[in-house]
Amino acid sequence: DDVWTTSDWCANVFQDTGFPHVKVYPHGIDPVWVPRRRKQSDKLKFLHIGEPAPRKGGQMVVDVFTNLFGNNPDYSLTIKAYKNNTTRIYNNYIDKNIIGLPNNIYNNIKIITEDYNESQLVQLYHDHDVLIYPSYGEGFGFIPLQALATGMPTICTYDWAHYKKYLGPLKLKSNLVNSTWDYAHPGKIFEPEYKHLVELMRDVAYNFNAYSGYYFAQSTKIHEDYNWDQLTNNAFKDNFKKFS
C-alpha cells in the first residue's frame, strides 16, 4: 500500500515514522492566478492572509509592520481573515496588555473579514505588492504559491515548502521547535525568525523594483511546473501503466 501526500517535507515525515512507500502529489495552480508586473508607486502595499489561525503568523506580521511602518502613509498592510481576526496591539512584550485592534490604532492597517470568492481573491493579490507569510508550517501552502504565481514578491518560511526554490531571496529563516499550540498543532513547528522578518520587510521596501522584477520573471515557470494536468499525469502514470 502507498501513502499519498502533498510535499517532499510531508513525505519525509511519513517515511521517518515507518511508511516506506510514499507518493508525492503536489497541489497545482489554476490559470486564473495570472502574473502581474508590479511597479513602485506612492504606497507599498503589504498583504497577509491566514487569520485567525495562529500558525499563519498574523500577529508577527502586525508586530513587525507596526515597528517598521506604523502610521507611515507610504506603506499599508491588509490582513485578509476568515471570519475573525485575532491580531492585537499590545502595550509591550512583557505585560502584553491589549491596547486595541490594529486597524483602530494604526491608520495604515486594514482588516478584511468578509468572505471572498476566487475572482475577488485574485484581485486582492493583484492589488497588493508583497505577501508576508511567516507560517509555522504547512501541509502544502496554497497561499504563497498563489502569490508567487501572480509574480508577487513573497516573504515566507521555506523548510516545509514543496516550491521552496521559487521563494528565492525572500526566504524567511525559521527554527524547528516544540509547538506552543499543543491543543491544535502538537509536535514540532517551524518558528519564524523575527529579526530576519524585520530585515526582509525593510529590504523589500527599499528595493522593491528589483524584487518585483525577479518574482515576475519566474511566474510563468511556476504556472508550467504546477499545472494541474501535468501534476496529475505525473502522479498517476505508474497506476496507468499497471492497468493499461
Where are the language model's segments positioned?
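Carbohydrate-associated surface elements
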Residues: 9, 28
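Conserved donor-binding/catalytic core segment of Leloir-type glycosyltransferases
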Residues: 39-56, 62-66, 77-79
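Nucleotide-activated donor-binding/catalytic signature segment of Leloir-type glycosyltransferases, i.e.
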Residues: 88-119
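Short alpha-helical donor nucleotide-sugar binding micro-motif in glycosyltransferases
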Residues: 122-128
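Aromatic "clamp/platform" in nucleotide-sugar-dependent glycosyltransferases that forms part
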Residues: 136
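A charged, aromatic-enriched C-terminal amphipathic alpha-helix characteristic of glycosyltransferases
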Residues: 189-196, 206-238
